[in-house]
Amino acid sequence: MSGHSKWATTKHKKAANDAKRGKEFAKLIKNIEVAARTGGGDPSANPTLDDMIKKAKKASVPNDNIERARKRGSGEEAGGADWMNIMYEGYGPNGVAMLIECLTDNRNRAATEVRTAMTKNGGNLGESGSVSYMFTRTGVVTVQKGDLSEDDVLMAVLEAGAEEVNDNGDLFEVTCAPTDIQAVRDALVEAGIEVEDSESDFRASVQVPLDADGARKIFKLVDALEDSDDVQNVYTNIDLSDEVLTELEND
């Protein structure tokens, strides 16, 4: 499997179609509110908030919605919810390990919706720690290629704690420890390189190879999970060959 696509299927993301756009907007707004509450409402002093706002704008979330979420999170405006981060663990079809990251104001609702989606699509929830040992939290910072070479990016981040620079097609992806994300961002900015995105991700240490039919079952389960407003991200340890990816693209 080629390096640039290896992780593209690790965290399966929804297609931005009209049917799911409303749910995606709600999740982006929620992230802005939480980021503002955690690190303050000034995007220039809160890189996480700045990233969340950029993601929302890229997804065409109205500016008014973005601003209200920022104010709710920072306390400038009343009405913010009491959000909780919860991580569920389990297995999908073919023994695929899954981490389901939720951001919710109702623990019981989140648990019920995750369990229902898993059960109806060939998965099952496990105990805490049942699959998380297979995953490592990783910092990921991405930049647009433009005229940059891989060496340009590597030289900029070498002293900032970067572990790898991967070629992901139109983007370069810099991986690092989650605690080094800000240092890597700062190093890129100092080198005149614009940061596209930065986040903490989960990378699996052991992958499960799947054929196209197996991948379709996992994607169906992931879509069912992400239909819940409480589910923010789903991470799996699937490994898809270039041949399987090509077959899936032709679906």
Curated annotation (Swiss-Prot):
**Per its UniProt record, what SUPFAM superfamilies does this chain match?**
YebC-like
Molecular functions per Gene Ontology: DNA binding
Q: Does the keyword DNA-binding apply?
A: yes
What Pfam families does the database record attribute to this sequence?
TACO1_YebC_N, Transcrip_reg
The record's keywords, sorted A to Z, are: Cytoplasm, DNA-binding, Transcription, Transcription regulation
A GO-annotated cellular component: cytosol
Residues making up the signal peptide according to the UniProt record:
none
A biological process (GO) of this protein is: regulation of DNA-templated transcription
Tell me which InterPro entries the record gives. Integrase-like_N, TACO1_YebC-like_2nd/3rd_dom, TACO1_YebC_N, Transcrip_reg_TACO1-like, Transcrip_reg_TACO1-like_dom3, YebC-like
Recorded superkingdom:
Bacteria
- Region annotation Disordered: where it falls in the sequence: 1-22
What is the annotated localization of this protein? Cytoplasm
Sequence similarity: Belongs to the TACO1 family.
The record ties this protein, via NCBIfam families, to: PRK00110.1, PRK12378.1, YebC/PmpR family DNA-binding transcriptional regulator
Protein name as annotated: Probable transcriptional regulatory protein Cgl1663/cg1872
Species per Swiss-Prot/TrEMBL record: Corynebacterium glutamicum (strain ATCC 13032 / DSM 20300 / JCM 1318 / BCRC 11384 / CCUG 27702 / LMG 3730 / NBRC 12168 / NCIMB 10025 / NRRL B-2784 / 534)
